[in-house]
A protein has these predicted regions:
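Charged, surface-exposed alpha-helical interface/stalk elements
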Residues: 193-281
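Catalytic phosphate-handling regions of large nucleic-acid enzymes and associated NTPases
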Residues: 1-222, 280
Length: 281
């Protein structure tokens, strides 16, 4: 009896690649809504939480705390620096030294010069209702949390981006914290599951929204759509001053947009940042 099933190789490749793309998206590229964390962020936070002594420790030591739970050691230190980034709205780490600020294109110092620990806010933000599963390494005597349930969705407050394989790129803008809290209170005070809150939380005030209110509400209701954003800028005496940029954008993105004009000496760009963003064109 023939044990083989004939199948078109092209269709088989499409199916397998689609499954692989979903695995990458769900396991690594996209954050979970229950805690707003990608898998590596969850493991880093959990490792710091479990081994917290209350003292500031070097990034290499923080990475060692997460290593038992994550299979890719080279990515852990970079994730820790992102968690301690000065541009985050919610501070999940207490830091010491120059941790940089990605929104202002300020790079962090080398790992050996900076230290940190899990913040008091992070300890309060994540609740204790945790379900455990075997680690990806399959160690018998060690489990990891399936998720770190959070009282507020981090991916909507600190923002998030993900580039999966064969699926749409995800970019979540940072939302206003007070608006998020009001939104959840509004939901919790109504028992009707079909109840729609009076207003959705707006993006933070560091960007301009070019989409209409109806488009924004549709995105939040359905989870689908594109949000058009732009910088906050002013113009006076032929000088453009930019004081706010959309999530994941920085001065280098602005420079690339006007690179041709800069090379032709038609425009000049100066990054006048100190602590706050200020790009002058």
């Amino acid at each position: 009896m023939n044990q083989f099933i004939e199948k078109d190789a092209t269709e088989l490749a499409k199916e397998n690649y689609r499954e692989y793309g979903l695995y990458v998206a769900q396991g690594r590229a996209y954050p979970q809504l229950i805690d707003g964390c990608k898998s590596v962020y969850k493991r880093v936070i959990y490792g710091m939480w479990q081994r917290d002594t209350g003292k500031i420790v070097k990034v290499s030591d923080l990475a060692a705390q997460a290593l038992p739970y994550h299979p890719h050691p080279t990515s852990i230190s970079g994730v820790i620096v992102q968690l301690g980034d000065g541009g985050n709205k919610l501070k999940l780490m207490d830091t010491q030294g120059n941790w940089g600020d990605s929104s202002k294109k300020i790079e962090a110092s080398a790992d050996r010069y900076i230290g940190g620990k899990i913040s008091a806010l992070a300890k309060k933000l994540f609740c204790e209702a945790i379900e455990y599963c075997p680690t990806i390494k399959g160690e018998i005597d060690r489990d990891e949390p399936e998720a770190l349930p959070a009282y507020l969705p981090l991916c909507f407050i600190n923002g998030s981006s993900g580039i999966p394989s064969g699926l749409p790129t995800l970019n979540i803008p940072t939302l206003d914290i007070i608006g998020m809290i009001d939104y959840y209170i509004d939901i919790l005070t109504h028992k009707d599951l079909k109840y729609k809150p009076k207003k959705f939380p707006k993006p933070n005030l560091e960007i301009n929204i070019h989409s209409s209110v109806d488009e924004w509400n549709h995105i939040l209701e359905t989870g689908k759509g594109s949000l058009k954003t732009g910088p906050i800028m002013s113009m006076e005496n032929n000088i453009i001053t930019i004081t706010g940029l959309p999530a994941s954008k920085n001065v280098d993105h602005v420079r690339k947009i006007i690179e041709k004009e800069i090379l032709l000496d038609k425009l000049d760009l100066r990054d006048e940042k100190k602590r706050e963003l200020c790009i002058v064109i």
